[in-house]
Regions:
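Long beta-strand-rich cores associated with HINT superfamily self-processing modules
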Residues: 12-124
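A glycine-rich, hydrophobic loop/mini-helix early in the fold
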Residues: 1-8
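Intrinsically disordered, low-complexity acidic/polar and Pro/Ser/Thr-rich regulatory regions
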Residues: 118-142
Length: 142
């Protein structure tokens, strides 16, 4: 992908429903436009990476008036975040031999699947306790 955003931020949420709620809340702001959405929660990357990436056009107010700049926001759960941090360290900050790197990559993929199942179970318990409705759609670009 080409560099598209001028700034970035990561929002860490407790539950997957919160990821979609917060992203939709931000997307509903009248002065913010959704430019692009990549939902790696519903469509994880091959390595197991899950996160919701939304690029917004956000107003920056200067003396000459409001100018819109692209800002990427990565929304993810706590579990998605610690998984991604470890995968990033394995991928970019290690000198492990290829065999060990491959072994750990497979283990991380297995962990990603396990975490997805655990998160779904925890989300269901949370919904039952709080009577919260299911929220599961990313904002729409355009």
């Amino acid at each position: 992908d080409n560099l598209f955003d001028g700034a970035g931020i990561r929002v860490i949420c407790n539950y997957r429903d919160d990821v979609y709620s917060v992203s939709n809340y931000l997307s509903s702001q009248s002065d913010i436009q959704v430019l692009r959405v990549k939902d790696y929660i519903k469509n994880p990357k091959q390595n197991g990476y899950r996160s919701l990436h939304v690029i917004y056009a956000v107003p920056v107010f200067l003396s000459s008036g409001a100018h819109y700049t692209p800002v990427e926001v990565q929304f993810r759960t706590i579990a998605m975040d610690y998984w991604a941090s470890l995968e990033h360290a394995l991928r970019y900050k290690t000198d492990l031999p290829d065999a060990k790197l491959s072994e750990h990559s497979q283990t991380l993929l297995d962990c990603a699947r396990s975490l997805q199942n655990v998160e779904a179970q925890m989300q269901n318990i949370h919904r039952d306790i709080n009577g919260a409705p299911q929220v599961g759609e990313a904002p729409k670009a355009g």
